[in-house]
């Protein structure tokens, strides 16, 4: 069972989840989308929060390091990799040469897609 913040519906995903579970999580807040934060070092992600910042804080409280965390939006009705949208305020970090809400470094985007691809059942 994933670690979970009951108050904010945030859970840490370390084992593959189904698209059905993502769709159910989406319905709780946004309808068609799930916010997620990926930890590139631990190869896990947090989902289910209303804000990427809440998921980021949850992961950091569980030992993640901020520089390894990247925010995405997941649209479970789309196919992979189109279901991933790189758009989050937590991604703005000039010290890592990322000056927008997107993920500007192509290698970092590929790593994020790899982690997400491994954590979502096809």
Identify the role of each PLM range.
Residues 18-26, 94-105:
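Short histidine-centered catalytic/ligand-binding loop motif
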Residues 14-58:
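Negatively charged, low-complexity tracts enriched in Asp/Glu with abundant Ser/Thr
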Residues 13, 26-30, 65-73:
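Short, mixed-charge, low-aromatic patches
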Residues 101-122:
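Well-ordered alpha/beta subsegment
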Residues 50-81:
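Amphipathic, interaction-prone secondary-structure segments
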Residues 2-9:
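Eukaryotic low-complexity, non-globular regulatory regions
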Residues 76-103:
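Intrinsically disordered, low-complexity regulatory segments enriched in Ser/Thr/Pro
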